[in-house]
Curated annotation (Swiss-Prot):
One of its GO terms (cellular component) is cytoplasm. GO terms for biological process: G1/S transition of mitotic cell cycle. This is Serine/threonine-protein phosphatase 6 catalytic subunit. The active site is at 115 (proton donor). InterPro entries: Calcineurin-like_PHP_ApaH, Metallo-depent_PP-like, PPA2-like, Ser/Thr-sp_prot-phosphatase. Keywords: Hydrolase, Manganese, Metal-binding, Protein phosphatase.
Length: 305
């Protein structure tokens, strides 16, 4: 079945910010789930690679990201989740990333973020967008079924860990991430939840998170986790950074944010992080695209998550 799918055609359609016929989207989602089923919770990735943070449905800025970092398959990518919600083109954004994954499975790794959740997408826009564009919720159901298959983390050359949110007090080793049951809705607490929701903070240990999910984690627990697991860098997303990226903990952790002018009003720049074969770090900064297009008249949501 997979060999007969018109993947190049779907990639080209999605690149034009068009969504697929409902039945084609269903087939695409099924194909990507087959691929994701083979991936580990901590998916190994080889350098060189480019690491990306939140996209949040900002389709035209995703095109700018690829213009900045290189097109798939010329560049190998890890996306650290939050593909949908808040932006006007969550459906087209996720469809494009799925089409690229189906066509070039070894050149793009898609991690789960806290917004890859049925509950969150019913509040922050993706559910309503699918309903509006397709006239029913089937597309949302197909896409959210893919969410449950997305992997939780990526490890680059055994040295750089990519995860959407951060660490968990219940996770000391990568092996403990590898045995998490991931094929389900994100739980409200526990290690799976923490990987999606936690944030670094200028503390040493752990504090409850003001988000109401996950934890604030500090420099000491980060250093311990990296030492135990032989890591030299943790890359994560999940927090808006005005400058596009922010280092913490003696440059051993970095937040990468890839949605410029977030929610079309925050005024921030975006970044992607390119690692070469020696894992040398090169941040590429890009700005929101300035172009005339008809913006749908749907209000953006306030920034709570």
């Amino acid at each position: 079945m997979s060999n007969a799918l018109p993947l190049d055609e779907w990639v080209e359609t999605a690149r034009q910010c068009k969504y697929l016929p409902e039945n084609d989207l269903k087939k695409l989602c099924e194909r990507v789930k087959e691929l994701l089923l083979e991936e580990s919770n901590v998916q190994p990735v080889r350098s060189p690679v480019t690491i990306c943070g939140d996209i949040h449905g900002q389709f035209y800025d995703l095109l700018e990201l690829f213009k900045t970092g290189g097109e798939v398959p010329d560049t190998n990518y890890v996306f650290m989740g939050d593909f949908v919600d808040r932006g006007y083109y969550s459906l087209e954004t996720f469809t494009y990333l799925l089409a690229l994954k189906a066509r070039y499975p070894d050149k793009i790794t898609l991690l789960r973020g806290n917004h890859e959740s049925r509950q969150i997408t019913q509040v922050y826009g993706f559910y309503d967008e699918c309903q509006q564009k397709y006239g029913n919720v089937n597309a949302w159901k197909y896409c959210t079924s893919v969410f449950d298959f997305l992997t939780l983390a990526a490890i680059i050359d055994g040295k750089v860990l990519c995860v959407h949110g951060g660490l968990s007090p219940k996770v000391r080793t990568l092996d403990q991430i590898r045995i998490i049951s991931r094929n389900l809705e994100i739980p409200h607490e526990g290690p799976f939840c923490d990987l999606m929701w936690s944030d670094p903070e200028d503390i040493e240990q752990w504090q409850p998170s003001p988000r109401g999910a996950g934890w604030l984690f500090g420099s000491k627990v980060t250093a311990e986790f990296e030492h135990i697991n032989g890591l030299n860098l943790i890359c994560r997303a999940h927090q808006l950074v005005q400058e596009g990226y922010r280092y913490m903990f003696d440059n051993s952790l970095v937040t990468v944010w890839s949605a410029p002018n977030y929610c079309y009003r925050c005024g921030n720049v975006a970044s992607i992080l390119s690692l070469n074969e020696n894992l040398d770090r090169d941040f590429k900064i890009f700005q929101a695209v300035q172009e005339e297009r008809n913006i749908p008249t749907r209000p953006t949501m306030q920034y709570f998550f």
